């Protein structure tokens, strides 16, 4: 499930593609009920909120359902394993790149306008993906979905603040968590039903086509209901920084996805090194731009803040593993064990249900480093039990064994990541908060793309090198799970660099 991205004026919200961050918007007003003296909110504002929530849910659904249709997609487009990796990575990587500038564009040209443009573009991307005759067109459609989704999503948070002033905002922001949970649980089931019933004979294409009608209705309703702004703001935009960051990440992800099938020629390694070098150039460019008094995509002072750096590392490591395991598990169940898409979706929602329960538990336990550690230990245990179960039973492993283990893993993920955003964001200054929020949400998407690329390549390499395809997929998932357990343990080690709880002063090196 993806997290709702953040503009400079928006608060942090739970991600939508990959594991959720399980947090409510950190800068939303108090959750207390509106006072009786507060003016009532008009019905049109609540209807506008529905439009915004539909956009958020569609993003969450789109990030989740494609893994269920993976085997059918490969058979239809005659693609190799890299196609599945690109189907996921193209979306998350393009969204991560777009999120760095999406919020600022809304401030410059108007949130309502950019929301509607983004929704129309997301619809066209869904339609292009559904109609794709070849793999390249499908990837282009996914890139379009990611970029335009990144343009659309940050605007919703800002518009809610104008639709629900004062104490009313808490109630509106409070609906985000439950709606994302619905997307997390309902997305895989919807995908499984569509694939099993296949009412229009579209097979995997129905997973993208299902977006079109809700998107069109949301655009029509949005034109009538979303608030009009008096004027846009005159701001500068760092196009150079945006291009550098996007190019760097593409240069890193491309060889990770394609390198195995190409035999790792020298140019793939050179591209990987070049992408890492470009990230360094991007950071230097951001520092120079900030020193010149111009707006930067990421405030350079954040990289002297221990809380922010530790949080960035934790999100990169934690989401890199957990974001990929969901997709690989779905592929193992279908391509390895021969489960139907519907049964696969039922098994995989156990993790989403666990996350939902974990979020609720995290709220009770409090936003502390200790809560994060407890959750991560449970997540590692769940992943380890899954690994041991598959290793012990091999091709005879069944849904009854995997479901409780995935529930445990999801519970740990929900508890562990619940306090993350609040601890990190309250560890930076007010001037850095907007930049930090956008950077963290982008990193969550980037880490998922990197995880899908690296663990996906390992998964398919092991599967291809094993005589029995069924055992090959089992061994591939075992290896990915083992690495993810190590990554979770590394995340636990990084917790020592975070404050004990939210709202402690930021600490700089």
Q: Residue ranges of each PLM-predicted region?
A:
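Cytosolic juxtamembrane N-terminal segment immediately preceding the first transmembrane helix
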Residues: 1-61, 75
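12-transmembrane solute porter fold
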Residues: 45-54, 58-61, 66-68, 278, ...
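Extracellular/periplasmic helix-loop-helix junction of adjacent transmembrane segments
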Residues: 69-98, 137, 342, 346
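Membrane-interface helix termini in secondary transporters
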Residues: 72, 103-104, 108, 193, ...
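Helix-breaking motifs and short loop linkers at transmembrane-helix boundaries and internal kinks
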Residues: 76-78, 110, 131-137, 338, ...
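Central cavity-lining transmembrane alpha-helices of secondary-active solute carriers
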Residues: 89-103, 149-157, 161, 349-361
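Helix-loop-helix hairpins in multi-pass membrane proteins, especially solute transporters
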Residues: 113-240
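Hydrophobic transmembrane-helix bundles of small-molecule transporters
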Residues: 197-313, 321, 339-340, 347
């Amino acid at each position: 499930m993806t997290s709702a991205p953040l503009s400079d004026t928006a608060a942090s919200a739970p991600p939508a593609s990959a594991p959720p961050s399980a947090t409510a918007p950190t800068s939303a007003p108090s959750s207390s009920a509106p006072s009786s003296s507060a003016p009532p909110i008009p019905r049109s504002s609540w209807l506008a909120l529905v439009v915004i929530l539909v956009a958020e849910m569609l993003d969450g659904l789109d990030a989740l359902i494609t893994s269920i249709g993976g085997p059918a997609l490969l058979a239809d487009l005659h693609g190799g394993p890299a196609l599945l990796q690109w189907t996921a990575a193209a979306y998350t990587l393009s969204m991560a790149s777009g999120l760095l500038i999406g919020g600022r564009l809304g401030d410059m040209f108007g949130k309502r306008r950019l929301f509607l443009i983004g929704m129309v573009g997301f619809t066209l991307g869904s339609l292009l993906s559904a109609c794709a005759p070849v793999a390249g067109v499908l990837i282009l459609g996914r890139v379009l979905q990611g970029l335009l989704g990144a343009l659309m999503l940050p605007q919703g948070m800002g518009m809610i603040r104008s639709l629900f002033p004062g104490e009313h905002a808490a109630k509106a922001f409070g609906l985000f968590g439950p709606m994302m949970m619905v997307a997390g649980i309902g997305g895989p089931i919807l995908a499984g039903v569509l694939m099993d019933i296949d009412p229009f004979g579209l097979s995997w294409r129905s997973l993208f086509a299902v977006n079109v009608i809700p998107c069109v209705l949301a655009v029509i309703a949005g034109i009538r209901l979303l608030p009009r702004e008096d004027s846009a703001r005159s701001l500068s935009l760092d196009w150079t920084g945006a291009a550098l960051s996007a190019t760097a990440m593409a240069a890193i992800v491309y060889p990770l996805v394609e390198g195995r099938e190409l035999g790792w020629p020298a140019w793939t390694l050179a591209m990987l090194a070049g992408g890492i070098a470009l990230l360094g150039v991007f950071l230097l460019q951001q520092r120079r731009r900030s020193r010149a008094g111009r707006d930067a995509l990421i405030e350079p002072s954040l990289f002297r803040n221990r809380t922010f750096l530790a949080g960035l590392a934790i999100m990169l490591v934690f989401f890199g593993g957990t974001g990929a395991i969901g997709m690989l598990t779905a592929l193992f169940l279908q391509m390895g064990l021969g489960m139907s898409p519907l049964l696969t979706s039922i098994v995989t929602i156990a993790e989403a249900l666990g996350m939902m329960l974990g979020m609720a538990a995290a709220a009770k336990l409090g936003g502390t480093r200790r809560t994060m550690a407890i959750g991560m230990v449970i997540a590692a245990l769940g992943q380890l039990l899954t690994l041991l179960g598959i290793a012990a039973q091999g091709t005879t492993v069944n849904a009854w064994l995997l479901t409780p283990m995935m529930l445990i893993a999801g519970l740990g993920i929900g508890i562990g990541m619940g306090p993350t955003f609040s601890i990190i964001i309250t560890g930076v200054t007010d001037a850095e908060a907007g930049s930090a929020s956008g950077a963290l949400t982008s990193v969550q998407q980037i880490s998922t793309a990197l995880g899908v690329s690296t663990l996906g390549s390992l998964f398919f390499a092991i599967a291809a090198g094993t005589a029995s395809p069924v055992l090959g997929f089992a061994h591939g998932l075992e290896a990915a799970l083992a690495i993810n357990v190590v990554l979770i343990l590394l995340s636990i080690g990084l917790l020592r660099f975070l404050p004990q709880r939210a709202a402690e002063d930021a600490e700089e090196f």
